[in-house]
Amino acid sequence: MSVFALGLNHTTAPVDLRGRFAFTLEQLAPTLQGFRERLTTGQRPGTPEAAILSTCNRTELYCAAEPQLVRPALEWLAGVGGVGADTLSHHAYMLEGGEAARHAFRVASGLDSMVLGEPQILGQMKQAVREADAAGTLGSTLHQLFQRSFAVAKEVRTATEIGTHSISMAAAAVRLAAQLFEDLREIRVLFVGAGEMIELAATHFSARAPARMAVANRTLERGERLASRFGAESIRLSDLPQRLHEFDAVVSCTASSLPLIGLGAVERALKVRRHRPIFMVDLAVPRDIEPEVARLDDVYLYTVDDLSAIVQSGGEKRLAAVAQAEAIIETGVQSFVHWLGQRGTVPLIQALNAQADSWRENELVRARKLLARGESVDAVLDALSRGLTQKMLHGTLAELHASDPAQRAQLATTVSRLFLRGAIPPDAVRPSGPREDDHLDGV
């Protein structure tokens, strides 16, 4: 069994393509179960383990499965997003084994985020694991991968200053607004949604004391709770088109599968505003604001991808923290690869133990019969020990005897390492073929 990660993120795919592969929490369990059903049909081997991490910046499918399932997994994901497999391949990354583990560790630690070191991704990954566990698709191999990811992320955040020298998406939005408006204390800000990202954006804007703030959310009660924290007004999402003109800045981030703010609504708002500019930030994937809105002369619309240049600033201290974090991650990768390799030998170890137990049981049955016939204990013990020795060595000696000269030296080295701890007797391996007196003593 192998571990692989298939995904696309803000560095490999545009926001519109990422939106095709965005999943809500409610969609994860049925999607994972559908994936497992699809890949366990026909002649495909094994039952794959799977988990999906879906955020505004990435969608990633983590699997523990046989290597030949990689291509079917890609085709399945492409079908879910309604694109061709070749199109997805062009924008996706496929990582296997140690590379997949390294990627998971970097994601959990915030090194692969648009905002370096951002803490939200760790919580999102933990939620993805809980959803996979509830769906029954997690499995012991992925469980180990993610638990090690969380441990590495904790060490990175404890031992380095990762994230200290970066700014958040919300802070970047405030910076952009400050470039457009002379005084943020005079603007009116509308937040659409009531999730973690909107809460963070409201915190940053509130620190600049805008003239007025409002929260529009589909669930009015949740919107009211957030609004009360910042002394803001709570409005119904259904009232948004009629009230859009009241606001100079709009920040939106919801889980809607369709845009909430359309071109027509913005055009009407601009007309009422006599074309005073509107600053808009769409942090949602899929988009909350129709992309055509960006064509309007008096609208300054920014998406998560547009904010990337701002949040990538950092300096030398940030580079030093990254180097420290990468070293911690590399140690974790080597440990996981070693564990995964050991896990691959488990079936062999189980088979060896079963074979040894079978030999032991057979010899015990034989010994008991000899004792019942009145044989001496010493004779029975001698026969039992010889029987076990012959069974243990027969297969190995037979392979040595049957091997050709080219194979014999390598096989002899392996046998020596396993049975003699590397001490090969002189003349144990000869370059020539078998001599006439070669035989299997005692077999």
Swiss-Prot record:
Keywords: Chlorophyll biosynthesis, NADP, Oxidoreductase, Porphyrin biosynthesis. One of its GO terms (biological process) is protoporphyrinogen IX biosynthetic process from glutamate. Pathway: Porphyrin-containing compound metabolism; protoporphyrin-IX biosynthesis; 5-aminolevulinate from L-glutamyl-tRNA(Glu): step 1/2; Porphyrin-containing compound metabolism; chlorophyll biosynthesis. The record marks 103 as: Important for activity. The keyword Nucleus does not apply. Pfam families: GlutR_dimer (PF00745), GlutR_N (PF05201), Shikimate_DH (PF01488). The active site is at residue 56. The keyword Glycoprotein does not apply. NADP(+) binds at residues 193-198. Substrate binds at residues 55-58, 113, 118-120, 124. Belongs to the glutamyl-tRNA reductase family. Possesses an unusual extended V-shaped dimeric structure with each monomer consisting of three distinct domains arranged along a curved 'spinal' alpha-helix. The N-terminal catalytic domain specifically recognizes the glutamate moiety of the substrate. The second domain is the NADPH-binding domain, and the third C-terminal domain is responsible for dimerization. Homodimer. Catalyzes the NADPH-dependent reduction of glutamyl-tRNA(Glu) to glutamate 1-semialdehyde (GSA). HAMAP family: Glu_tRNA_reductase. PANTHER family: GLUTAMYL-TRNA REDUCTASE. This is Glutamyl-tRNA reductase.
